[in-house]
Amino acid sequence: MKYLSLVAVLLLLVSCNKNGVAQKPIKTELDSVSYAIGMDVAKNVKASFDDFDNDLFIQGFTNALDSTDILLDEAEAQKVVRAYFQKKQQEEMAKRQEEAKANKEAGEKFLAENKTKDGVQTTESGLQYIVLKEGTGEKPTTASKVKVHYHGTLIDGTVFDSSVDRGEPTEFGVTQVIKGWTEGLQLMKEGAKYKFFIPSDIAYGANPRPGGKIKANAALIFDVELLEIVK
């Protein structure tokens, strides 16, 4: 496990006494490297496991280093840590599943209400769109590369990506994007501007990019202007 490997490294690098961490001045290059590695590994441990009891954490280091006053043998320690992280993983998975379910329901409710509004058209896939401005050029195909401006938001208005805000259009292949975009772009002519309301199953579904504003099963809204069919 990641946590256990980090602890193993720490046990080799960190020197503690029973009153806390020993304070030593940095005198040599090796001192600096040792201290820097200790800082880096400690940050990684905190990022992986931030709710530990600091005193017992240090006590565990100290006991393992000098092999005295051991409260848990190695097998028991591994069993405890493994069980704890399995439980945390299950709790996190359950939380993500609940959030994904709530996002799905919120998106479906939004789209059900949105489809009844003036100007909203719905395709067989569930993609909804409004024509903000019709174009006069050609329509792209799945073989096309296009240049577009876009502004993407969640259904609550949160902006997650925008070439408009960046002030620079972007280019990509029609099939190199989410399914809702691939379908929607082929409805447009060069020069057109549409607003797309995209169900989660033709957006990023249950597996959006990690760490982003788009969460699992989120419905998305895009203002898209098709500037040019590049090829």
Task: Describe the predicted segments one by one.
Residues 1-14:
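Sec-dependent bacterial lipoprotein signal peptides
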Residues 3, 16-231:
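Cross-family detector of peptidyl-prolyl cis-trans isomerase
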